[in-house]
């Protein structure tokens, strides 16, 4: 009863606060639909907010404003608006808007995804840039990725005629790719539901669900500490479960390094241990890497397979190119540069099915002017990568799956072409773009 009473008091208080703030809100915000008291525009979002945002952009333009509870949110919906947010005003708009449920176990303070652009964040980015996502490291790991891919193919052939959950097989393969990059060993045995990877997948997917679900504390700050729906507890449980998957491996490696003649494998875990990072920083960094590099990639590959099924001519064109360039042998990563149609297919998949339809929310560190509108300090900024990829003003016949549109185009997805930003851009661009490119 106490929780209900506190919630009612908070809601009544927020109503009056909303009415006061609405009268004194800063002028010059981008246009947007009229908000309701307390809930703002929350009821207009539905289950696929990126789709609703794209519809709102047709009415309100490049930038529009929403009220999500008491939170002011500005949404960028065109390449021009994305360029302004992610490039022209990158430094001012590089703050992170962090969900209340994720503020557990000091994860945010040690996360390359959620932390502010402070010294810890810079240190973690530097480790990734200079030790993990280097051209040399990518090339050295090419053989491992090819081996794991062939293991997946053999597993699928072995189970021909038997129903398999393809996304789980892809996920397990990607986990093993990262497992070998980081720990020099597999984490997942394909087809073995008792292995640690299945538990990891469940925890990571649950965290992504929580990140995409409404939490009253995110929109009504007075409710933030109550955890009314148990989301913060769920995230804490997920973090504990994921950390447990590789916790024993980290402990074992630390012991080996302490021994005078300890046999260490000189992989990425050794790099992390030698870099002076503590266990919390290592755990958060590994979680960021596994969650960003496995589930989202598996989802994108699943969409790619779906498009192949729906578009037999595209499948035939890819097969023809492979036979012409590669022949009947297995495809190697070194072949990709000579497969322009396959590259175009990947870009088209990312255009229509970006791994993160709405880029991770940013926050304005200071008030600034964007496209002649005022973006107030602490405002949340979202970039609709899904909507930008389907913008009829940018793309001809935008809903048609057509890799041919990229054959004579220089547009790429590495953060310089704002028509295609599946991995973001600016200082917050996904640090794993190079290996992501290698995988798909």
UniProtKB/Swiss-Prot annotation:
Pfam families (UniProt xref): p450
Q: Which UniProt keywords apply?
A: Alkaloid metabolism, Heme, Iron, Membrane, Metal-binding, Monooxygenase, Oxidoreductase, Signal-anchor, Transmembrane, Transmembrane helix
Q: Which CDD domains match?
A: CYP76-like
Gene Ontology BP terms? isoquinoline alkaloid biosynthetic process
* Top-rank lineage group of the source organism: Eukaryota
Q: Which residues cross the membrane?
A: 2-21
Subcellular location field:
Membrane
- Primary enzyme class: oxidoreductase
* Principal location: membrane
A molecular function annotated in GO for this UniProt entry is: iron ion binding
Question: Which family would the database say this protein is a member of?
Answer: Belongs to the cytochrome P450 family.
Role, per record: Involved in the biosynthesis of benzylisoquinoline alkaloids. Probably involved in papaverine biosynthesis since its transcripts are abundant only in cultivars with substantial papaverine accumulation. May catalyze the 3'-hydroxylation of (S)-coclaurine.
Task: Output this protein's name.
Answer: (S)-N-methylcoclaurine 3'-hydroxylase-like protein
Native species of this protein? Papaver somniferum
Lineage at the top is:
Eukaryota, Viridiplantae, Streptophyta, Embryophyta, Tracheophyta
């Amino acid at each position: 009863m106490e929780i209900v009473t506190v919630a009612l008091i908070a809601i009544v208080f927020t109503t009056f606060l909303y009415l006061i703030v609405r009268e004194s809100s800063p002028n010059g915000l981008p246009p947007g639909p009229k908000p309701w008291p307390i809930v703002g525009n929350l009821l207009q979002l539905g289950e696929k907010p990126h789709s609703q945002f794209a519809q709102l952009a047709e009415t309100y333009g490049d930038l529009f404003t929403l009220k999500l509870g008491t939170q002011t949110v500005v949404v960028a919906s065109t390449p021009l608006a994305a360029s302004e947010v992610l490039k022209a005003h990158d430094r001012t708009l590089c703050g992170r808007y962090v969900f209340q449920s994720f503020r557990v176990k000091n994860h945010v303070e040690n996360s390359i995804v959620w932390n502010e652009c402070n010294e810890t964040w810079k240190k973690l980015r530097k480790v990734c840039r200079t030790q993990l996502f280097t051209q040399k490291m990518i090339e050295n790991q090419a053989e491992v990725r090819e081996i794991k891919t062939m293991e997946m193919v053999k597993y699928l052939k072995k189970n021909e005629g038997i129903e398999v959950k393809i996304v789980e097989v892809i996920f397990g393969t990607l986990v093993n790719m990262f497992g070998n990059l980081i720990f020099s060993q597999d984490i997942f045995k394909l087809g073995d539901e008792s292995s640690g990877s299945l538990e990891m997948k469940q925890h990571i997917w649950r965290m992504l669900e929580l990140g995409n679900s409404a939490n009253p504390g995110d929109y009504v700050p007075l409710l933030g500490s109550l955890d009314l729906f148990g989301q913060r507890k769920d995230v804490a449980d997920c973090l504990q479960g994921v950390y447990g998957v590789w916790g024993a491996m980290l402990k074992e490696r630390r012991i080996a390094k302490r021994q005078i003649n300890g046999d260490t494998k000189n992989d990425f875990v050794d790099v992390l241990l030698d870099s002076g990072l503590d266990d919390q920083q290592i755990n958060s960094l590994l979680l960021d890497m596994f969650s960003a590099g496995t589930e989202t990639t598996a989802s994108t590959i699943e969409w790619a397979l779906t498009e192949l099924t729906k578009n037999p001519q595209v499948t035939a064109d890819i097969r023809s190119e492979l036979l012409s360039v590669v022949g009947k042998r297995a495809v190697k990563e070194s072949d990709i540069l000579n497969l322009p149609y396959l590259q175009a297919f990947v870009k088209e998949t990312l255009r229509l099915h970006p791994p993160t339809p709405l880029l991770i929310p940013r926050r304005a560190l200071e008030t600034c002017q964007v496209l002649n509108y005022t973006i107030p300090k602490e405002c949340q900024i979202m970039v609709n990568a899904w909507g930008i990829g389907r913008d009829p003003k940018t793309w001809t016949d935008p809903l048609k799956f057509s890799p041919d549109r990229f054959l004579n185009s220089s547009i790429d997805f590495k953060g310089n072409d704002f028509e295609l930003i599946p991995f973001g851009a600016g200082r917050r661009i996904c640090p794993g773009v190079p290996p992501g490119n290698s995988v798909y």
